[in-house]
């Protein structure tokens, strides 16, 4: 199990989990926010908010009431980066800086100059890698 300390919010994994449920159960169940919440282990309100984000990103269709959700795009065409963006993760900084480095200190005064571009490079590397991974790849690993 991954125990990293980076700042990607749980929204990304909730979004992936949501899309996997929609695809995996599409032929057997009406995949509603309550149904998905039972798999994810969160309140259905959190799933409804995520479904709205995924809908706004044109990844899912959600039928009003208890109509359920369905993918608008095949899983092999949905990249993890698409999901990352839809979940709003690209709007947040991957790495959060401590708030008050001492500007009078030779380290604290230059820490941003020394580290910011490296953090941007790491963020770009992650995003580039996410673009190569598809929801269908994750789907296949569920069956292992």
Feature map (PLM): residue ranges:
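Short coil turns linking two alpha-helices in DNA-binding domains
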Residues: 43-46
